[in-house]
Design a protein with these regions (language model features):
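Short alpha-helical elements
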Residues: 1-248
Length: 248
């Protein structure tokens, strides 16, 4: 977690130059770098539980959902890639084709992560919303892009008390949208900013992985580091509490 918030771009340099030299008082039983890499996978489950139970935020009635690609190699090296062979898949995003995984995220208007899910690159963006574990403890409005449009998905989430808000396509006749929903769609860039900070600051994506276990630990460490950021992207939302609701 400390590495993802340190500014270092290489874990080996951070461990040898920072931890081994200046943080020995915090880690008296320090091990070699090779042994440290071998021990990483043992903290995957405790780290995931720590994120789920402690670090994630709470739903406030306004949530945003999006997915971002996690490339594991360049497209030219797909056929000779061995580390994630049989696990990673080809997918397509707004930037084109890629080979790797997708990181699905939910956040509130404060920039706090509410939940996350990792899937192969060829999984539809709407698929995680079908899993109860991904949309639990969520209510109110859920803002997404056009990739989440679907009649069955909208009806299913509406029954669960969730209003899915997406941009309208040109062939969607008779669809109306309130002014407040249009304003929320304009603010959907907040989750794009979250994705940007995860990739450029927390380094959730890089192509130097040598095992699938350490790939998962790297993602969990980046998410944990982001949750601990003192300043997160947020939008100013003013809520009006109507006393007429008390009549019902």
């Amino acid at each position: 977690i400390l590495f993802h918030d340190s500014g270092y771009r290489c874990l080996k340099h951070f461990y040898l130059e920072k931890v081994c030299r200046h943080l020995r008082h915090l880690f008296p039983k320090i091990v070699s770098y090779n042994r440290f890499v071998e021990l990483e996978k043992e903290v995957a489950v405790p780290l995931a539980l720590f994120i789920k139970k402690v670090l994630l935020g709470k739903c406030t009635g306004i949530s945003f959902v999006d997915s971002t690609p996690l490339r594991v190699c360049r497209n030219q090296r797909i056929h000779i890639h061995k580390v994630f062979k049989g696990i990673a898949q080809r997918g397509k995003c707004s930037m084109g084709w890629f080979f790797g995984f997708k990181l699905h995220l939910r956040c509130n208007e404060k920039g706090e992560l509410l939940n996350f899910m990792i899937t192969p690159g060829d999984v539809d963006d709407r698929k995680p919303l079908e899993y109860k574990a991904f949309v639990e403890f969520i209510y109110g409005k859920l803002v997404a892009d056009k990739g989440y449009i679907g009649k069955n998905l909208f009806r299913r989430m509406f029954v669960d008390g969730i209003q899915l808000i997406t941009k309208l396509k040109s062939n969607m006749k008779g669809a109306l949208m309130s002014v407040s929903d249009k304003l929320l769609l304009r603010k959907r860039a907040i989750i794009e900013t979250v994705n940007d900070e995860l990739k450029n600051i927390a380094q959730v994506e890089h192509s130097r992985h040598r095992s699938f276990d350490n790939f998962i630990v790297n993602i969990l460490g980046a998410i944990a580091a982001y949750c601990m950021f003192p300043k997160k992207p947020c939008i100013n939302v003013q809520r009006t509490f109507d006393t007429q609701l008390a009549l019902f």
